[in-house]
Amino acid sequence: MLHQMMKAKLHRATISAADLNYEGSLTIDTDLLKASGIRPYERIYVYNVNNGERFETYAIEGEAGSGAIQLNGAAARKGMIGDFLIIVTYALCSDDEVDEHRPNVVLLNPDNTIKEIVK
């Protein structure tokens, strides 16, 4: 049996920009992608702490060190600059893998710098 387990999480990312006319996705600072293990173009689940919106899209790379968390395309309607997001990916684990699996959790400061990495 396969179990869907949390693979990575960016906790309390702050929306820094939104571009309704961009073709879609969520731009994330490359440093945050690397720290969390989220890959460019990977499906992400996004939970807006401020308004309760929940949606899925895909991650694209933003400039390293920029703190970019930018809603693009239709997702730009799902939050406002300054809102806090939880960004999550999931992976399938077999029965043999599930007990040893640990997600990468990156806790963020309000300026999208890394506060702590929990593994």
Swiss-Prot record:
Task: State one Pfam family annotation.
Answer: Asp_decarbox
As recorded in Swiss-Prot or TrEMBL, the protein's gene is named panD
Its quaternary structure? Heterooctamer of four alpha and four beta subunits.
What does it catalyze? Answer: L-aspartate + H(+) = beta-alanine + CO2
Tell where it localizes: Cytoplasm
Pathway(s) it belongs to: Cofactor biosynthesis; (R)-pantothenate biosynthesis; beta-alanine from L-aspartate: step 1/1
Protein name as catalogued: Aspartate 1-decarboxylase
Describe the family membership recorded for this protein in Swiss-Prot or TrEMBL.
Answer: Belongs to the PanD family.
Q: What does this protein do?
A: Catalyzes the pyruvoyl-dependent decarboxylation of aspartate to produce beta-alanine.
Q: What cofactors does the UniProt entry give for this protein?
A: pyruvate
Q: Which NCBIfam families match?
A: panD
State its Enzyme Commission number(s).
4.1.1.11
Post-translational note? Is synthesized initially as an inactive proenzyme, which is activated by self-cleavage at a specific serine bond to produce a beta-subunit with a hydroxyl group at its C-terminus and an alpha-subunit with a pyruvoyl group at its N-terminus.
Broad enzyme group? lyase
Q: Which GO terms describe its biological process?
A: alanine biosynthetic process; pantothenate biosynthetic process
Which GO CC annotations does the UniProt entry carry? Answer: cytosol
The residues annotated as the active site are 25, 58
Q: Where does substrate bind?
A: 57, 73-75
Residues recorded as bearing Pyruvic acid (Ser) in the entry: 25
| Taxonomic source organism | Desulfotalea psychrophila (strain LSv54 / DSM 12343)
Mind listing the UniProt keywords for this protein, alphabetically? Answer: Autocatalytic cleavage, Cytoplasm, Decarboxylase, Lyase, Pantothenate biosynthesis, Pyruvate, Schiff base, Zymogen
The GO terms describing molecular function are: aspartate 1-decarboxylase activity
Main location as per UniProt: cytoplasm
The record's PANTHER family line, in alphabetical order, gives: ASPARTATE 1-DECARBOXYLASE
